[in-house]
Amino acid sequence: MFSSFSFLNMFGVLFTVFNLTVVQPYPSHIIIKSFGNNEEVSRVALKAMEYTSDHINSRDDVPFKLAFDHRVVEEGAAVSWNMVNAVCDELKEGAMALLSSVDGKGREGIRGVSDALEMPLVSLTALSNDDHQQQQFGNLFEVSVRPPISELLADFIVHKGWGEVLVLIDPVHASLHLPSLWRHLRTRTNTSVKASMFDLPADEKQFEAYLMQFNMMRNNETNRILIDCASPKRLKKLLINIRSAQFNQANYHYVLANYDFLPYDQEMFQNGNINISGFNIINKDGREYWSLKKHLKTSSSLGGGDDVSVEAAVGHDAMLVTWHGFAKCLQANDSLFHGTFRHRRFFNRGFPGIYCDPLSDRSHPNRPFSSFEHGKTIGVAFRNMKIGHKEGTLTGNIEFDRFGNRKNFDVSIVDLVSNTKATFNSKEVLAWRQGVGFFSNRTVAQHSRKSQNDHKDNQVIVLTNLVAPFVMIKRECLEMANLTECQGNNKFEGFCIDLLKLLADKIEEFNYEIKLGTKAGSKQADGSWDGMIGELLSGRAHAVVASLTINQERERVVDFSKPFMTTGISIMIKKPDKQEFSVFSFMQPLSTEIWMYIIFAYIGVSVVIFLVSRFSPYEWRVEETSRGGFTISNDFSVYNCLWFTLAAFMQQGTDILPRSISGRIASSAWWFFTMIIVSSYTANLAAFLTLEKMQAPIESVEDLAKQSKIKYGIQGGGSTASFFKYSSVQIYQRMWRYMESQVPPVFVASYAEGIERVRSHKGRYAFLLEATANEYENTRKPCDTMKVGANLNSIGYGIATPFGSDWKDHINLAILALQERGELKKLENKWWYDRGQCDAGITVDGSSASLNLSKVAGIFYILMGGMVISMLAALGEFLYRSRIEARKSNSNSMVANFAKNLKSALSSQLRLSVEGGAVAQPGSQSHNAIRRQQVAAFLPANEKEAFNNVDRPANTLYNTAV
């Protein structure tokens, strides 16, 4: 009994210790409850949150997963009460954080539950940002991911110097907290700002009539209008009506009091002579933006113009805030939630779930009212966190003040101002930071548009850079730079130079001066640009005409013309050696398997013909002898069958043919077979031996990515690097990680360095560059590079001009005219192919070429081998026959002398072979020798008959063919 008890105790202790050692430091999942309504804003935010949650859970490096669940709360008169009931129902199953995308009374309901139960709440709507109000009614457990806009609007009004504003308030969806706006205005200016408020109609169909009536009332006054509308759908409808209004809007300036000024809206007002300003907080440079955009596009949840709306971006960032908040808690205390999950259920302070009303828990009547035991810890972690672009946020830097509001976030302000002297509105993009205001330099891309008349008296400064064959310095100008012909624009040549000449012919008074720039330009940390884009933004140039690719980052700060050339990223490798042919290349049109089958068919058909000829009575030949007897013979012996079948296969004839039906059927089938085989072989042989192929080690980007033998790289810091870095395509992401991890680095500083590396690495390095440069270099000596595979993407080269430049429309029309006439294609052929230094020659696909000895040497070897074997066989027959003659002569002789008889036989056979024939007179030695030879082998009659028939006329000729 004692030993049994001790054993059980020991087993229990070991079991307890084992359980303690295998406990995971982190919970397997964190329960997140989300609440929204059926409105478009909430649905778009939900799509983004679901995507982000799934993306986080799909990663292998995360210590815990997110158990995300969403509930739709019906709108109505009692929306606040409905929200409270919905939240309380969900909390009964357990939750560790709440997410809310609702505003108004519904938001107040969920905030009340969060505050009462100390449940962390991440809100997708902006807080009031009113310190006084939040000190009295604030929720210490709530953080808002959507930045407040009151401070920004106040700074913008002060920046513009406006003394009066009008506020158009959407009665259905309004988000602007006016008391907070006035509070910020009072702290920023001593000048009073007058404000008037107007309600928009609830029915979207009445927007047009409302605007007309509004204009009749305010036509003679300056109107600075703040539009407070949180619904993207209603806002878009309102903007369309503003854009299409027929009255003069020069005295109007609209400001969108939200962060929904999408590129689609900017394009709509680009040439409308309407003053409008908007704000944007979405960072479009990261891979996360393009991945989310692709997902939302698949689910038809994108905003206007197929862009990610601010609701989707905030939903994405709200999920990141939630995950990083819990990660921060667990990093500080990895055992924080050890008692939270038991038997796969959520427990709070020893009881399952969280109840708003403890009396409703009939399973636990003694349950007290208790808040979430970890709520304060999680709430503090939320408010103390700081994440940014590195963690994948779309709305920039995320950190919160003591009230849960966003702080230190950046906003770009797009200000479109009508210009009566130009076709397009002038555009100014300002940078603003919360707590700081407008940056000291203020301008991310600030430049005014001048009218065309301002340019007529001056030359158009055109920037370009030296990239062959777009722009090059003439060879004679390199050697003798002081020549008169090498001054100014005359020293340049190339595709872009010819394009400028064509544009000058098409555009009136387009007098240009070419200046050399350095690189295209890239965005700096402070928002400014270097390179030719920076020169354009600073006003020191009027246009950039070069191999400048059009991308969204550059499009934000400059205008591009219609593409004058389309290209894409391609792969350059060293041209492989031509395929080497073996001496038996003539056998390669048919596989080894086919050759074996032909040999088996040859033997099999020969056997079949032999058998049917033996069994068919029509193949036997009966001949009467001179003595009255009969001889029965069959021409199709085994050797003759093999010879007949081989001759048919070689398309030759023989002296024997089958006479029976069965033999002819077998022969016809074999002839048909050989006809098809020989015809197919001839066709394949002609194509094979006259087509030179180069076996490229890779043929596509997929081949390049899945191998490691050939390294590959790109030019660092250019548009190609941006393509791989921010691509959402999995294979391009893998290639980018590979290139970043290589030591020594595979990145190069210029195209010239990358091309030289391709040539010097003996086929072990591939360079990814734009197809235009690839194709051009492939036509230049030493002609040892080639392009493989299709282009990875499609991009265009365009002419860059400042925003609203008068030249943009003229350049666009000229480029379209040149495209329609085929002038641009002629220029491309001129500079890429007509001046090529390499023969069209051989490509990867192959091209026709004449036969050479290396391809058909095997045929000559077989011919020579056949001749040698034939001569050896003839020698063997000669010796064999001489030996037989000597043996017979030795047996008939009275005195046996085999050596002498062999010598005589060899001499006789040699004489016949050399002379080619002889006339033997009766009684002569030659006559007797021939008679013996006939008797021995050649004559079919017996020996006696042979001797009786040897008496013939003296002039009978016996040759070696007998």
UniProtKB/Swiss-Prot annotation:
What does the UniProt keyword field contain?
A: Cell membrane, Cell projection, Endoplasmic reticulum, Endosome, Glycoprotein, Ion channel, Ion transport, Ligand-gated ion channel, Membrane, Postsynaptic cell membrane, Receptor, Signal, Synapse, Transmembrane, Transmembrane helix, Transport, Ubl conjugation
Q: Which GO terms describe its molecular function?
A: AMPA glutamate receptor activity; enzyme binding; glutamate receptor activity; glutamate-gated receptor activity; transmitter-gated monoatomic ion channel activity involved in regulation of postsynaptic membrane potential
Tissue expression per record: Command interneurons of the locomotory control circuit (AIB, AVA, AVB, AVD, AVE and PVC) and motor neurons (RMD, RIM, SMD, AVG, PVQ and URY).
Q: Which Pfam families match?
A: ANF_receptor (PF01094), Lig_chan (PF00060), Lig_chan-Glu_bd (PF10613)
Carbohydrate-modified residues are 190, 220, 275, 333, 441, 482, 852
Q: Which residues form the signal peptide?
A: 1-25
Pull the Extracellular topological domain ranges from the record: 26-591, 690-855
Q: What GO cellular component term, any one, is given?
A: dendrite
Q: How is it modified after translation?
A: Ubiquitinated. Deubiquitinated by usp-46 which prevents its degradation.
Mode of membrane association: Multi-pass membrane protein
Report the outcome of residue 888 to R.
Increased levels of glr-1
Q: Name one GO biological process term.
A: positive regulation of backward locomotion
Quaternary assembly: Interacts with sol-1. Interacts with cni-1; the interaction negatively regulates export of glr-1 from the endoplasmic reticulum to synapses. Interacts with usp-46; the interaction results in deubiquitination of glr-1.
Q: Which family does it belong to?
A: Belongs to the glutamate-gated ion channel (TC 1.A.10.1) family.
Its function?
A: Non-NMDA (N-methyl-D-aspartate) ionotropic glutamate receptor. L-glutamate acts as an excitatory neurotransmitter at many synapses in the central nervous system. The postsynaptic actions of glutamate are mediated by a variety of receptors that are named according to their selective agonists. May contribute to a sensory discrimination between mechanical and chemical stimuli. Plays a role in controlling movement in response to environmental cues such as food availability and mechanosensory stimulation such as the nose touch response.
* Name of the protein described by the UniProt record: Glutamate receptor 1
Q: What is the lineage of its organism?
A: Eukaryota, Metazoa, Ecdysozoa, Nematoda, Chromadorea
